[in-house]
Amino acid sequence: MGCAGSTLRSGASFEDSRLAAIEDSRFHEVGHHAQFEDSRLAAIEDSRFHEVGHHAQFDEGGRFKQLPPANDDAKLLVADHPSLGVIRLDYDYPPALGDVDHPGSFYYDVFYRVVPGLTFELCQSGELPDDVKQRFIDAITWLDEQGVAGITGDCGFFMYFQALARSVTSKPVFMSSLCQLPAVVCAYAADEQIALFTANGESLKPMREIIKKECGVDPDDTRFVIVGCEDVPGFEAVANGDRVDVDSVVPHLVRLAEDTVAKHAGTAKPIRAILFECTELPPYSDAVRAATRLPVFDSITCCNSMLASLMDNPRFGVNNWHLSWDGAHTAHRFGDNVPPHLKGKLVNREHPENIARWNASLAERSSFSSAQQESIGRGSRKL
């Protein structure tokens, strides 16, 4: 690191000739290894770093930011806090935090669109009648028109419609967590295994051909270990459309993961990573990571990596996009955003628990003062 007032590699210097007052941090250099104790460069007092050549600076929060060159006439693209678009099945249930259908699972805004008539059974079959297919296309188009940065689905079986979805939009489309398979496979040696966890082990078998076609990966390869969660106590609530008691399921799912990893430990093909196919498995990802010390890829990591490709980096990006979002997710009810003439085509209805939650949020909002209403912004469409 350059000393106070010194010229750095690009000919840059600190305006006040010193790097001062790093809040709650003490920089230590041992040999050639240096680190910040609190893992961040924070609150540089009265210092903003400017690099003339690349127009870089430290902002007031101590974050290193890049600015476009002063003589660059190119238009600066300022993202309006990149958001995610989610295609929903015609199926409602009380989602747990961590589920794709729970907006609180994401650190960015989410727009949902239900496809009337697209039930779980239809999605699992991989075939869409012409009318449902058109509604699916219309739903992708609608999400695109909302300006979402990328699109996904709320069921792993949406892998069947990956090609259809991407033919409708130029936005990145990862309709299933399985879209991560090529990257995960590339990360490990051929003699290292990857465990694929799914809600039901048998249900993944018919998807082999579409996975090979879309991902270039053969799930029949011996490097994959297919693990079904159908016998995990408490997880049957997923199949029943009921609320899952996450706390009660965690120890059982963790035990399943530990046993799966242990079974292959010490063999010629140890398990090196886990991928959750089902969109209702991410609530358990952190517990499994902690127990197995293995990477766990799921539908949330899939969406995060997709959105990160269009996000401003909070450390050295350009636009501070993250400051343009108020942190309140756009509220969504089952069937919202479906055109009125198609609402009658919905096969399922809103889950009673979700109705109660919505009504409770309305009652809470109605108790706010006018000033408080103004402060939360965008009125009753926020939860």
Swiss-Prot record:
Belongs to the aspartate/glutamate racemases family. ALMA1 subfamily. It comes from the Eukaryota. Its EC number is 4.4.1.3. GO terms for molecular function: dimethylpropiothetin dethiomethylase activity. Keywords: Lyase. Signal peptide: none annotated. It catalyses: S,S-dimethyl-beta-propiothetin = acrylate + dimethyl sulfide + H(+). Homotetramer. Mediates cleavage of dimethylsulfoniopropionate (DMSP) into dimethyl sulfide (DMS) and acrylate. DMS is the principal form by which sulfur is transported from oceans to the atmosphere and is a key component of the ocean sulfur cycle. This is Dimethylsulfoniopropionate lyase 3. It comes from Emiliania huxleyi (strain CCMP1516).
